[in-house]
A protein has these predicted regions:
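RNase H-like polynucleotidyl transferase catalytic core
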Residues: 111-115, 209-214, 228-246, 263-265
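C-terminal domain-tail junction helix/linker
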Residues: 221, 228-232, 256-305
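An active-site-proximal beta-strand-loop segment
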Residues: 136-176, 182-184
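Basic, flexible linker segments flanking DNA-binding modules
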Residues: 3-8, 31, 40-142, 296-302
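Conserved, non-catalytic sequence blocks in retroelement Pol enzymes and Pol-derived host proteins
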Residues: 90, 138-140, 214, 241-243, ...
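Helical coiled-coil/dimerization "stalks"
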Residues: 1-34
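Active-site beta-loop-alpha junctions of metal-dependent nucleic acid enzymes
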Residues: 160, 179-203
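Mobile genetic element proteins and their domesticated derivatives, centered on retroelements
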Residues: 30-31, 41, 65, 81, ...
Length: 305
């Protein structure tokens, strides 16, 4: 299946290659290879801070929208939210902006549609939770069978916020895929899933389970559709129970304790720090629970057994 990248995704890939391999002198070549203009790449690079600020502003407004959405049990659309904002919070926000943010972050109201012919399509659009199939049986001694995922926030550069999405192998502790973003829109989990697919070379364990919390990313119908397409079974923690995904929480805890990410002055610097830590963690972090091996070594050990 051929993957078509948008110009923005191509620019992001070029920037990643240049940063990862320190190849500053081949911008023109990479742009030509990707079929994009050199001037377009530099314009995209220059606008990065503007995009980050716009995403941060969106997130502030979205958190307010989300609080109302949850308060009303996910049964309100853009117009009711606009009226609640004005009357209860004294905040004036255009209904088109509210609708845009709801669409951007995947909020879909559970409201009854007057048209009976749309009932079936509506049902497919509602967020759905999944049972806790895993039941804390994280280590099943089979690489790729238990896949744990979650998102955490990272504050850097005087209060700017980024979000780190990861997938961890429950048997080997290896971080199989990760994606860092300045926004919480659905793209963060789509990108993570795509990187997981690439890391696994699209060859998943026949009984693979993807375990997460009940966050709106993981209950979103489009995300669930993508997981199902990979023939992976979804499992979710019980509401408000962080112990149901303890190994993933543990990794984030170690990262925050060991990395001076708050000292980063830019998103690019933070991204480099995250990439470097995960590379070191997977390949050079010896763990007592893995028979004193690294996650990558332990994966090889289990596969050879």
């Amino acid at each position: 299946e051929k993957t078509i990248l948008t110009p923005s995704e191509k620019f992001e890939l070029i920037e990643y290659i240049i940063r990862q391999h320190q190849l500053k002198n081949i911008v023109s070549y990479l742009c030509e290879l990707a079929g994009v203009s050199r001037s377009g790449y530099y314009a995209w690079l220059k606008a990065a801070s503007i995009r980050q600020q716009k995403d941060l502003d969106d997130e502030v407004d979205f958190e307010l929208i989300l609080s109302i959405f949850k308060q009303k049990k996910e049964k309100v659309g853009a117009l009711p939210i606009k009226m609640i904002l004005e009357n209860d919070y004294y905040v004036v926000m255009n209904h088109k902006k509210i609708r845009r943010l709801m669409r951007k972050y995947g909020l879909i109201a559970k409201v009854r549609n007057a048209n009976p012919y749309k009932k079936m399509s509506k049902a497919t659009q509602e967020h759905k939770t999944c049972p806790n199939i895993l039941k804390r049986e994280f280590n099943q001694e089979e690489p790729g069978k238990v896949l744990l995922t979650d998102i955490t926030y990272l504050y850097y550069a005087n209060g700017q916020k980024a979000y780190l999405s990861c997938v961890k192998d429950g048997s080997t502790n290896e971080i199989l895929a990760h994606y860092l973003s300045t926004s919480l829109k659905m793209n963060i989990v789509y990108k993570t899933l795509k990187r997981l697919k690439e890391a696994m070379q699209n060859q998943f364990h026949p009984e693979a389970i993807l375990h997460s919390d009940q966050g709106f990313h993981y209950t979103h119908p489009l995300f669930q559709k993508r997981v199902k397409k990979l023939k992976i079974t979804q499992s979710m923690s019980r509401k408000g129970n962080c112990w149901d995904n303890a190994p993933m929480e543990s990794f984030f805890g170690h990262f925050k304790d060991e990395v001076d990410y708050k000292e980063c002055n830019s998103f690019i610097e933070l991204k480099q720090m995250v990439d470097s830590y995960i590379e070191e963690y997977n390949n050079h972090r010896y763990q007592w629970g893995l028979k004193k091996m690294t996650p990558v070594q332990y994966r090889g050990h289990l596969l050879a057994a």
